[in-house]
């Protein structure tokens, strides 16, 4: 049984939302560039399979971190944008960047 009062449960929940491979890099792209289309993310994240990117975006959307917005254009266009909940992850992504700069190669 899950103990919600355990201090690590909040960390475990955060990891369940953003801890999958590529997810933090997807978030980084949103913080660097703002709203993104699928192909823009695909081009930026060299090496990620389209199915993986699609799964990560679906998970972020399901968890309320990103919204998918559709535009009535020809051809139809969808764009992903951070929600208020997603923008609150900015300090976490920033701290990861700072740590990487300090201790990376």
Q: Which ranges hold each PLM region?
A:
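Basic, amphipathic "hinge/linker" alpha-helix immediately C-terminal to the N-terminal HTH DNA-binding motif
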Residues: 19, 72-95
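Short beta-strand "wing" residues that participate in macromolecule-binding interfaces
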Residues: 68
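Residues within the DNA-recognition helix of helix-turn-helix
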Residues: 56
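Hydrophobic alpha-helical core bundles mediating ligand binding, dimerization, or RNAP-core interactions
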Residues: 11, 15, 93-100, 104
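Glycine-centered, phosphate/nucleic-acid-interacting loop/turn motifs that mediate DNA/RNA or nucleotide
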Residues: 64
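N-terminal helix-turn-helix DNA-binding core of bacterial DNA-binding proteins
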Residues: 2, 9-52, 73, 79
């Amino acid at each position: 049984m899950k103990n919600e009062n355990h201090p690590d449960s909040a960390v475990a929940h955060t990891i369940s939302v953003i801890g999958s491979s590529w997810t933090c890099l997807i978030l980084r792209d949103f913080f660097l560039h703002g709203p993104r289309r699928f192909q823009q993310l695909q081009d930026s994240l060299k090496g990620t399979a389209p199915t993986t990117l699609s799964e990560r975006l679906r998970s972020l959307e399901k968890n309320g971190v990103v919204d998918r917005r559709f535009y009535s254009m020809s051809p139809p266009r969808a764009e992903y944008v951070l929600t208020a909940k997603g923008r609150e992850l900015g300090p976490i992504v920033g701290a990861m960047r700072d740590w990487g700069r300090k201790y990376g190669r």
